[in-house]
UniProtKB/Swiss-Prot annotation:
Tissue: Red blood cells.
CDD domains given in the database record: Hb-beta-like
Organism of this sequence: Cheirogaleus medius (Fat-tailed dwarf lemur)
InterPro entries for this protein: Globin, Globin-like_sf, Globin/Proto, Hemoglobin_b, Hemoglobin_oxygen_transport
Binding site for heme b: 64, 93
Protein name: Hemoglobin subunit gamma
Stored PANTHER family: HEMOGLOBIN FAMILY MEMBER, HEMOGLOBIN SUBUNIT GAMMA-1
Domain Globin: 3-147
Length: 147
């Protein structure tokens, strides 16, 4: 279980309140599919993923990215119970979708990059550290059913 300090929780929730879930979610998932093309195999029903521009403009990528970040928003509300928050999604991704749990870490890292890009100077080293901890905690929670 990941333990967040009061300061880390404040930093995470403060920035989260400014995040455009649709935009950041689509961009983070799109970046994952471009930078790590083997992850595309989990999204064969998304249509054209033949190039970076096709991926970044794909409405299904954007919609799923929004869905992913909406789930992250629930986790931010429940930072003290990430495992419980993601129990169902962990089971789904493990048992039905057979997603390599390493991909959760990769997507988390892409999200941190997107947040840094969007928030610039506001994304200080302290903010980055808190968010890295958050996405790592989420990756652990999502991988829980794999163990």
């Amino acid at each position: 279980m990941v333990h967040f300090t009061v300061e880390e929780k404040a930093v995470i929730t403060s920035l989260w309140g400014k995040v455009n879930v649709e935009e950041a979610g689509g961009e983070a998932l799109g970046r994952l599919l471009v930078v790590y093309p083997w992850t595309q195999r989990f999204f064969d029903n998304f249509g054209n993923l033949s190039s970076a521009s096709a991926i970044m403009g794909n409405p299904k990528v954007k919609a799923h990215g929004k869905k992913v970040l909406t789930s992250l928003g629930e986790a931010i509300k429940n930072m003290d119970d990430l495992k419980g928050t993601f129990a169902h999604l962990s089971e789904l991704h493990c048992d039905r979708l057979h997603v390599d749990p390493e991909n959760f870490k990769l997507l988390g890292n892409e999200l941190v990059i997107v947040l840094a890009k969007h928030f610039g100077k506001e994304f200080t080293p302290q903010v980055q550290a808190a968010w890295q901890k958050m996405v790592a905690g989420v990756a652990i929670a999502l991988a829980h059913k794999y163990h």
